[in-house]
């Protein structure tokens, strides 16, 4: 009799995805972030579910319900801070996962890459709506500023904003619908993740060399399950250190003040993981131009497979591309820093230069480096 995991219709899918999956023998720890993202997603759904049991999506009681969760619910503070800091861990893993895809040329798996970018966009939308729910000052003003950007769209802009708000300002209707969407989106993300994995297993994993690994593969279990578990332990160590010792390190003090439409915070800014896009938005003086730049900063990732000019897939053997890649990483760190600073010189100028370099490196420098390296290798 054959092993049940190989014959049972449901077990067979799990077996082919996580146990007997043929995997390149040389994939490094940079390939751990996919499983870490899965763990983050499960953690967020579980903690979010428990928070939703005690949260009320009403402008009068939302802030109080968060206070109630932290003070009166058993381990409510732990669930709340795990959820808040879990989002930061999620985006940290997400950015490293995308960075790995860019460095090792994984974007040449077109379907997997495109589904991944759609996942990024949905995750960003989910995180933004979640930030509005505590109904603190930064929640309210962040929602007002970011949703108001859509009014820059010609003809339909103003109507679109009021349609999203469900009112003439960010109000009870806005909070209720944001809670509804924030609850349902993670389940859409789970479905998209399954499609992401389906396309990945269709093509097979990439590896650090970027060369085909058909002749040298090993089973996923036990080798990579153990490796993933080690990564998960490290991630939980960092997450729990944040939650238990520095729960408010990545938050904003303004969000401990209840939302007040009559008082604007001195400096409106989103969570740290949106700061790079926020800096690009602010670097253009024109409203519509800023909104287009904001959307393009994410949508530009769709172009990467078509901008690949090198004969080598991975950047491992490409020193010029490596330099440009690490300059791009530095540039994103600078943009993140600029997004948290007030709108005044020299921050305005630095933000504009960093924004120009961001688009320049992806659209021109990386493809150009590929052509130069082809010539250097005499291909």
From Swiss-Prot:
TM segment ranges: 33-53, 77-98, 113-133, 178-198, 226-246, 288-308, 320-340, 347-367
GO cellular component, one term: respiratory chain complex III
UniProt membrane topology term: Multi-pass membrane protein
InterPro entries to which the protein is assigned, alphabetical: Cyt_b/b6_C, Cyt_b/b6_C_sf, Cyt_b/b6_N, Cytb/b6-like_sf, Cytochrome_b, Cytochrome_b_C_euk/bac, Cytochrome_b_N_euk/bac, Di-haem_cyt_TM
Residues the entry annotates as binding heme b b562: 83, 182
Molecular-function annotations in GO: metal ion binding; ubiquinol-cytochrome-c reductase activity
Residues holding a ubiquinone: 201
Subunit structure, interactors included: The cytochrome bc1 complex contains 11 subunits: 3 respiratory subunits (MT-CYB, CYC1 and UQCRFS1), 2 core proteins (UQCRC1 and UQCRC2) and 6 low-molecular weight proteins (UQCRH/QCR6, UQCRB/QCR7, UQCRQ/QCR8, UQCR10/QCR9, UQCR11/QCR10 and a cleavage product of UQCRFS1). This cytochrome bc1 complex then forms a dimer.
Protein name: Cytochrome b
Organism from which the protein derives: Erinaceus europaeus (Western European hedgehog)
């Amino acid at each position: 009799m054959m092993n049940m995991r190989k014959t049972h219709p449901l077990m067979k899918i799990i077996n082919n995805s996580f146990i007997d999956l043929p995997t390149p023998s040389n994939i490094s720890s940079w390939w751990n972030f996919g499983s870490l993202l899965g763990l983050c997603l499960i953690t967020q759904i579980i903690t979010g579910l428990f928070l939703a049991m005690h949260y009320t999506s009403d402008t009068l009681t939302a802030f109080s319900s968060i206070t109630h969760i932290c003070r009166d619910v058993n381990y409510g503070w732990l669930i709340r801070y795990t959820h808040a800091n879990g989002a930061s861990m999620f985006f940290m893993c997400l950015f490293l996962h995308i960075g790995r895809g860019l460095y090792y040329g994984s974007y040449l798996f077109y379907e997997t890459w495109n589904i991944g970018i759609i996942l990024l966009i949905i995750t960003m939308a989910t995180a933004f709506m979640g930030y509005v729910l505590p109904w603190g000052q930064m929640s309210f003003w962040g929602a007002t500023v970011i949703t108001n950007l859509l009014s820059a769209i010609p003809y339909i802009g103003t109507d679109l904003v009021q349609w999203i708000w469900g009112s003439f300002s960010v109000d009870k209707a806005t909070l209720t619908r944001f809670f509804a969407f924030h609850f349902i989106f993670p389940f859409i993300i789970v479905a998209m993740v399954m499609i992401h994995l389906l396309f990945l297993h269709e093509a097979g994993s990439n590896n650090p060399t970027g060369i085909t690994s058909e002749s040298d593969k090993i089973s996923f279990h036990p080798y990579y399950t153990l490796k993933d578990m080690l990564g998960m332990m490290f991630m939980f160590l960092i997450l729990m250190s944040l939650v238990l010792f520095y729960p408010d390190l990545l938050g904003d003090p303004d969000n401990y003040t209840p939302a007040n439409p009559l008082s604007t915070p001195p400096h409106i800014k989103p969570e740290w993981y949106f700061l790079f896009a926020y800096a690009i938005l602010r670097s253009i003086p024109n409203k519509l131009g800023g909104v287009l730049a904001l959307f393009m900063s994410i949508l530009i990732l769709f172009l990467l497979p078509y901008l690949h000019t090198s004969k080598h897939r991975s950047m491992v053997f490409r020193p010029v591309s490596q330099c440009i890649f690490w300059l791009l990483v530095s540039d994103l760190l600078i943009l993140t820093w600029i997004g948290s600073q007030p709108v005044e010189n020299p921050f305005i100028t630095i933000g504009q230069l960093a924004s120009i370099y961001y688009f320049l490196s992806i659209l021109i420098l990386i493809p150009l480096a590929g052509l130069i390296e082809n010539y250097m290798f005499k291909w």
